[in-house]
């Protein structure tokens, strides 16, 4: 089972489960812990191959979003958590959206930061080039290049550093498995875009998240259960670069439940 960490407020408090993205770990949420634990039980999970869950799935050759989502569901089942709000960043937003499809009763609401709903043409080209080069280049060279492209500006540096420093802990074999998984995600994303969202959802995007923002804007226009808050002058990793703003928006949304 995946490794996790609990901050328990009280037996009556609602649960909030945090899901990081590819290459990260639950440590990506270090700027959220104090704000959220004031009123909620908090569950931080390290996805397979990441953080404290590293090395647990070495015999598995190929991953799917289904099995990764079920990993998370297994943790909540083990802890006897019947319902939780979910907060995800980047690729983690795909996982929580998938959990809402697989086991909707488990999801009370979703907060999706730096959400990925569609890979634009540039990102698809980058993924293809990275896949070709992964056999000859060190995996961190590919990851650092992606980090610089997704978070290109000087003011994105702190987010970029967190992004890269966590990825350094990822084994090469693990990186390749997640990379292949991401390369095959387009059919799942198409399915998500076609479906009406089935849970109250808040999308929090950086105004400078040029790869992913436009797809989210279009999606929210067509889904009455979805809200969008765009943080100006902010890149992809909004919970790090604009932590106070992110926390205030998120907690305001959760206070409605």
Q: What do these predicted ranges mean?
A:
Residues 5-57:
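Conserved HGGG/HGGXW glycine-rich cap/lid loop of the alpha/beta-hydrolase fold
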Residues 88-92, 96:
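Gly/Ala-rich beta-loop-alpha elbow adjacent to hydrolase catalytic centers
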Residues 121-123, 139-195:
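Conserved alpha/beta-hydrolase catalytic His-Asp/Glu region
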Residues 31, 98-102:
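Active-site signature of alpha/beta-hydrolase-fold catalytic machinery across serine-
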Residues 34, 43-87, 248:
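Active-site loop/oxyanion-hole signature of alpha/beta-hydrolase fold enzymes
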Residues 101-102, 107-137:
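Flexible "cap/lid" loop of the alpha/beta hydrolase fold
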Residues 240-252:
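Post-His helix in hydrolase/transferase enzymes
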Residues 200-234, 240:
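Conserved loop-alpha-helix segment in the C-terminal half of the alpha/beta-hydrolase fold
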